[in-house]
Amino acid sequence: MPKKSGSAAGRNVRIADQIQRDLAELIQREIKNPAMGLVTLQSVTLTPDYAHAKIYFTVLGAEPEVAGAILNEKAGYLHSLLFKRLHIHTVPTLHFHFDGSVERGIEMSRLIDEANATRAKDD
């Protein structure tokens, strides 16, 4: 019996969510580097063959480039720890990317507030 087309996509999402939860815990417990700051994992996307995972993160108290470099340097170690936790055939190679959307949202909100304040002053 052929699989439904949505079932593969659903499995991909479930595995990505599990990877995000496990990685968040592993990063907190295993990576003790004060230069990294407080890292929050925003999302995980997987390739259809589960070979690669893009992990999008934000950081507080550190430069995004520094945190990204540390995370990508520790990606192999995190991969090995993840392999012990996940019960799937292929654990993806991890690629960490800074998610600047939060900062862009804050900047847009600031600009809107500034424009509204200017408009109120003019009235």
Curated annotation (Swiss-Prot):
GO BP, sorted A to Z: maturation of SSU-rRNA
GO cellular component: cytosol
Primary localization: cytoplasm
Top-level taxon of the source organism: Bacteria
Keywords: Cytoplasm, Ribosome biogenesis
Keyword Cytoplasm assigned: yes
Record InterPro entries: KH_dom-like_a/b, RbfA, RbfA_dom_sf
Keyword Cytoplasm among record annotations: yes
Coiled coil feature spans: none
Sample GO molecular function, one term: ribosomal small subunit binding
Subcellular location: Cytoplasm
One Pfam family recorded for the sequence: RBFA
Function statement: One of several proteins that assist in the late maturation steps of the functional core of the 30S ribosomal subunit. Associates with free 30S ribosomal subunits (but not with 30S subunits that are part of 70S ribosomes or polysomes). Required for efficient processing of 16S rRNA. May interact with the 5'-terminal helix region of 16S rRNA.
PANTHER family per UniProt: RIBOSOME-BINDING FACTOR A, CHLOROPLASTIC-RELATED
Assigned protein family: Belongs to the RbfA family.
Subunit structure: Monomer. Binds 30S ribosomal subunits, but not 50S ribosomal subunits or 70S ribosomes.
NCBIfam families in UniProt: rbfA
Protein name as annotated: Ribosome-binding factor A
Lineage per the UniProt record: Bacteria, Pseudomonadati, Pseudomonadota, Betaproteobacteria, Burkholderiales
